[in-house]
């Protein structure tokens, strides 16, 4: 029988090896308790090390953001379904600040403010994230706004131009066409996208804040119909969402846009609308028992919007030269632009496009009030061709509005005033556009130039839009060389301008107004009638035009 021997050295070595390789499967967590909850706000005790804006995890994987850091408890906004959060439940720290996934995979998708897809098209694969609260580009990291961003809307591109990197406010009462103007600007980027050149392409982000779900679906359908979802991301926080989602949605949109901007790409972000974000933030602040100020808004509501809109920039060439252009929308009540939120955002932005309900109801659409709409970037954000032809347009329209108001009380007007009223009425017609029908910059330059030359003066006001549409179709055929020379917004030279006028004069000879009249002067009409040999006799009313 073998003798059993036990070596103390072997036992000691085995124990040492085991203890050296042992790693305890334990983690240290800070856990707090919900003390009370209501309307998407929870107060949590027992998390002394929590940071401002840190993500907290509630039962069921629901997230919250720590906003109030008091001595004994935390005030948190719940992001998601807050109805199942109850007093006494455990809350854990995550150690992370709120961030969203970013990248080209988001193009063509509809997401919520947490970056999660809500369009039923599957998960979005992205390996990169970006924090929602980041410092905007510094002064030295920027360059002046000089590159135009064409909206396809004649009244904006001619009189209140928008540049890449600008913040242009769209403001007006409800149902005045604010969303339609911004969607047109998105649709107009399709031609740039199809070039495949990243220096021309503009990626678009539409942020819907507090809109009806059906309205957001309508916007998505309009973008899909025109093929614009290919380069667009929709961040949706509909009216049914909690106040926390409505508060965060604009920051999510700008974070996704900033990612592309720092890659040297161009981005357009539409915030529709920031009034509802401010109202959501007011609700959150009041529930967190923060002291209210003017109109019950908290004291930092200005900072809410300024830190968001300051992220718009045209980066320096050293950082890639990318840009983030913002079109924030603000809803007014009874055209009152002096209310708290409108004045705040007007002071932050680089200009505003004011849409007036009276003009809208008169059929002037887009209903842009030329008098108080302004772009602080101005001609620097216009192409040479547009700058050359639109110089006097704004002044003429402003004078027309003033004279129109005066003429309502005047019994008799001199010939010059009548001529100015006639010209102004035709300019107003010329600037009207159908919804979702952006116009290429070349057509805009031609139309505005010919209007300045008096080509439309002999056209009845009711026929101006039909005359313009048929004229542009004809010029594309007969003056294609002119269009080629002004492609991309280049300036009209004297020879091309002369060719345009000559081609237009020929077209006018064939155009018949809806009342049967010719749009040429009396002598030209007589000559044309005399030359109609072998044709059926037509009784033509002649429009007398004083040139």
From Swiss-Prot:
GO terms for molecular function: ADP binding; ATP binding; proton-transporting ATP synthase activity, rotational mechanism. InterPro entries: ATP_synth_asu-like_sf (IPR023366), ATP_synth_asu_C (IPR000793), ATP_synth_asu_C_sf (IPR038376), ATP_synth_F1_a_nt-bd_dom (IPR033732), ATP_synth_F1_asu (IPR005294), ATPase_a/bsu_AS (IPR020003), ATPase_F1/V1/A1_a/bsu_N (IPR004100), ATPase_F1/V1/A1_a/bsu_N_sf (IPR036121). The lineage of its organism: Bacteria, Bacillati, Actinomycetota, Actinomycetes, Mycobacteriales. Its EC number is 7.1.2.2. It holds the Pfam family ATP-synt_ab_N. Produces ATP from ADP in the presence of a proton gradient across the membrane. The alpha chain is a regulatory subunit. Gene3D superfamilies: 2.40.30.20, ATP synthase alpha/beta chain, C-terminal domain, P-loop containing nucleotide triphosphate hydrolases. Keywords: ATP synthesis, ATP-binding, Cell membrane, CF(1), Hydrogen ion transport, Ion transport, Membrane, Nucleotide-binding, Translocase, Transport. This is ATP synthase subunit alpha. It is a peripheral membrane protein. ATP binds at residues 172-179. It catalyses: ATP + H2O + 4 H(+)(in) = ADP + phosphate + 5 H(+)(out). The record marks 373 as: Required for activity. It comes from Rhodococcus jostii (strain RHA1). It comes from the Bacteria. The keyword Ubl conjugation does not apply. F-type ATPases have 2 components, CF(1) - the catalytic core - and CF(0) - the membrane proton channel. CF(1) has five subunits: alpha(3), beta(3), gamma(1), delta(1), epsilon(1). CF(0) has three main subunits: a(1), b(2) and c(9-12). The alpha and beta chains form an alternating ring which encloses part of the gamma chain. CF(1) is attached to CF(0) by a central stalk formed by the gamma and epsilon chains, while a peripheral stalk is formed by the delta and b chains. GO terms for cellular component: plasma membrane; proton-transporting ATP synthase complex. Belongs to the ATPase alpha/beta chains family. It is found in: Cell membrane.
């Amino acid at each position: 029988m073998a003798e059993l021997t036990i070596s103390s050295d072997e036992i000691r070595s085995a124990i040492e090896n085991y203890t050296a390789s042992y790693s305890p499967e334990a983690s240290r967590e800070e856990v707090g308790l919900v003390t009370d909850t209501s309307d998407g706000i929870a107060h949590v005790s027992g998390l002394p090390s929590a940071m401002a804006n840190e993500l907290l995890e509630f039962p069921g994987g629901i997230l919250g953001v720590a906003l109030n850091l008091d001595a004994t408890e935390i005030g948190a906004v719940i992001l998601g379904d807050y109805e199942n959060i109850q007093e006494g439940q455990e809350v854990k720290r995550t150690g992370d600040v709120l961030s969203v996934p970013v990248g080209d995979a988001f193009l063509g998708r509809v997401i919520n403010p947490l970056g999660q897809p809500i369009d039923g098209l599957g998960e979005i694969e992205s390996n990169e994230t970006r924090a929602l609260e980041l410092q905007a580009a510094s002064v030295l990291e920027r360059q002046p706004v000089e590159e135009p961003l064409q909206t396809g809307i004649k009244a904006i591109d001619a009189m209140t131009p928008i540049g890449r990197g600008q913040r242009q406010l769209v403001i007006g009462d409800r149902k005045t066409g604010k969303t339609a103007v911004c969607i047109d600007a998105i649709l107009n980027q399709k031609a740039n996208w199809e070039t495949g050149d990243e220096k021309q392409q503009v990626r678009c982000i539409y942020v819907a804040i507090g809109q009806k779900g059906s309205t957001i679906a309508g916007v998505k359908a309009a973008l899909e119909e025109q093929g614009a979802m290919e380069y667009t991301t929709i961040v949706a926080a509909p009216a049914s969402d909690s106040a926390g989602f409505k508060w965060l949605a604009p920051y999510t949109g700008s974070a996704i846009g900033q990612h592309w901007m720092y890659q040297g790409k161009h981005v357009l972000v539409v915030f529709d609308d920031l009034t509802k974000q401010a109202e959501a933030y007011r609700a959150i602040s009041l529930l967190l028992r923060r002291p209210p100020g003017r109109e019950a808004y908290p004291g930092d509501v200005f900072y809410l919007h300024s830190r968001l809109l300051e992220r718009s920039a045209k980066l320096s060439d050293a950082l890639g030269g990318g840009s983030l252009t913002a079109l924030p929308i603000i809803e007014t009540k009874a055209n009152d632009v002096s209310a708290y939120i409108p004045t705040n955002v007007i002071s932050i932005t680089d200009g505003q496009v004011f849409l007036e309900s009276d003009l809208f109801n008169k059929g002037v659409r887009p209903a842009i009030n030329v008098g108080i709409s302004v772009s602080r970037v101005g001609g620097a954000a216009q192409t040479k061709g547009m700058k050359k032809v639109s110089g006097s347009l704004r002044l003429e329209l402003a004078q027309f509005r003033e004279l129109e108001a005066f003429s309502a009380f005047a019994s008799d007007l001199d010939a010059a005033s009548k001529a100015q009223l006639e010209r102004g009425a035709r300019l107003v017609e010329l600037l009207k556009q159908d919804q979702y029908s952006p116009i290429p910059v070349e057509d805009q330059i031609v139309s505005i130039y010919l209007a300045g030359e008096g080509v439309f003066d002999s056209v009845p006001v009711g026929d101006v839009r039909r005359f313009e549409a048929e004229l542009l179709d004809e010029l594309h055929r007969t003056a294609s060389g002119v269009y080629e020379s002004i492609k991309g917004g280049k300036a009209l030279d004297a020879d091309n301008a002369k060719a345009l006028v000559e081609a237009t004069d020929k077209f006018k000879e064939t155009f018949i107004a809806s009342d049967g009249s010719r749009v040429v002067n009396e002598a030209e009409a007589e000559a044309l009638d005399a030359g109609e040999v072998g044709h059926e006799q037509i009784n033509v009313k002649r429009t007398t035009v004083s040139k």
